Structures are given as C-alpha cells and as structure tokens.
Amino acid sequence: MSRPPRLTASDFDPEVLDLFDRYVHGQIDRRGFLSGAAGLLAALTPQFAAAQQVKPDDARLKTSFVEFASPDGYGKARGYLVRPAKARRLLPAVLVIHENRGLNPHIEDIARRLGLAGYIAFAPDALFPLGGYPGDEDAARALFQKLDATKTRQDILAAARMLRTLEGGNGRLGAVGFCWGGGMTNFVATQVPELLAAAPFYGAAPPAEDVAKIRAELLVVLADNDERINAGWPAYEAALKAAGTHYTTFRPPGTQHGFNNDTTPRYDERAAHDAWSRLLALFERTLRKGHRASPG
C-alpha cells in the first residue's frame, strides 16, 4: 500500500499554519484549534451578498432564466439571460461560463456587469440536468462530480449556438469563463469558429491538436501562484504561436487561482480590476467594432 504524499508548508494557507503553531506550542488547546479551523472555513465561504455589484432587479437590465434545446447534450439546458433594458440597436452577445460550482450568485452578478457594459450576457448552468445550482457550494461541488462531461460540453456548445441567433443580437459572439469555465472557454474556442473573442480565466488548456482550430482572439488570464493550470501554459502557448492565433496574456504577480472572484479571500482587487478592464477592451474592439489585433 503506497503512502500518501507528504505535505509541506507550501500546501497550507499561512493562517492555518499559524493556528497549528499556536496549538503545538500550547497557546490553544485542541478545542481551540478546531474552533479556529472552523472559523477559517467560514471565512473562506463565498460572501455573495457583500460582493454583489449589480442588484438582480436593477432597472437598467432585463433578466430572465431561459431554457434551450441541447439535442447532443442532456436534451434541455437552462441559463441566466441578461440584456440592457433600453438597447437601441442590435448587440453582441457574451457566453459566461461558471466555475465548478454551477450558476451561483457570483456568476449571475458577472453576467449583469456585462449587461451594464452593453452586452447580451448568457450564463448557462451546467448543473441544470441535476436540479440546478443547489444554493450551497459544497453540495454544488459534489453534484459536479455526477455530470456526464461529454453531455455537459455539448450543453455549453448549444448555449453558444443559441446566442448567435438570439433575438436582439447582432451575431457577434464572445466568451469568458473562470476556473472550470476557463477550461470550457478554451474548449468552446476550439469548437465554435464563429467565436470572435474569448477570455479564459485560469482555465485548463485544450488538447494541443485542437488549438489550430481557434479563430477567436484570446485574452489568457493566469494567476501567478497556480501550479496546476500554469504547468500546461508553455505547451498551450507554443501551440498558439505555431497556429498564428491572436492572443495576449495577463498574469498579475502574487495572485492566486480564483483572484477575480470577489466573494472569496483569494480576491485581488487591483488584479481583478485590471483583468476586467482588459476583458472589456477586448470585447469592445472585437465584438463591438469588429477589429482584430496582430497575432501574439
């Protein structure tokens, strides 16, 4: 029987190590240690209400939950649709792909932020076939493990196709995704040649053999301290260069995986602000004006 890998200090948050040190040196007892650990866990729990930037009933927006067909996926899928309330012209659309928690309040807020920026935003819920986002992050994480990955990918592609022909849209399509959604954004870029722009935030790279299929311009956002995702970046970048894909990268120093998520302690305000500004600049140029940059 093999031994589990030995963990080192770098595997733990400094606050956890400080708490453990105080326990080892008798400054707190076991009960105090467990109580403190529980407090840390509570502190790490997403604070959706506190981080909300755009209220669900903001009068400047029209929001609704929309079901759509996904014949190659689970058959039927559902997502959160946001559009400016008083649009005077046809608008570009943005597919918003959530983390591995489903369509939680944070991702709905991201969609509303894009709505206020003048886009039609649509955030599909990968967990819809299993009842949808359950309202609890731990339960959502557990549900994610039960999804059929092939069907889920097809649901996301069906959402992209639906957006291209949505009433009120001008046919121009972009995508942004975070964590699991970042990897899914990379996948969508390899499968939807009509996609004009994509911004995968700390997402897994697509298979190298599929990179040449990408026609969208990419903004690849990486966290500085993200060993798992960053390990795949050199090969992904080499494939992008070989294919002549238009791309830029943004890797703000000192950031953690999930730094854009303003509901958790991993949030880095300055880095998130800069990443969002770059995202909006990409969409403004490619989706609204139809311009492309030079290859990366």
Across the structure, where does each feature detected by a protein language model lie?
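Cap/lid segment of the alpha/beta-hydrolase catalytic domain
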Residues: 127-150, 258-263
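Short beta-strand/loop motif that positions the catalytic acidic residue
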Residues: 220-222
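N-terminal secretory signal peptides and thylakoid transit peptides that target proteins
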Residues: 18-44
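Primarily recognizes the serine-hydrolase "nucleophile elbow" in alpha/beta-hydrolase
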Residues: 158-215
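N-terminal cap/lid segment of alpha/beta-hydrolase-fold proteins
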Residues: 52-86
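N-terminal secretory signal peptides
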Residues: 1-28
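Gly/Ser-rich "nucleophile elbow"/oxyanion-hole loop immediately N-terminal to the catalytic nucleophile
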Residues: 137-176, 291
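Short beta-strand element of the alpha/beta-hydrolase
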Residues: 90-98
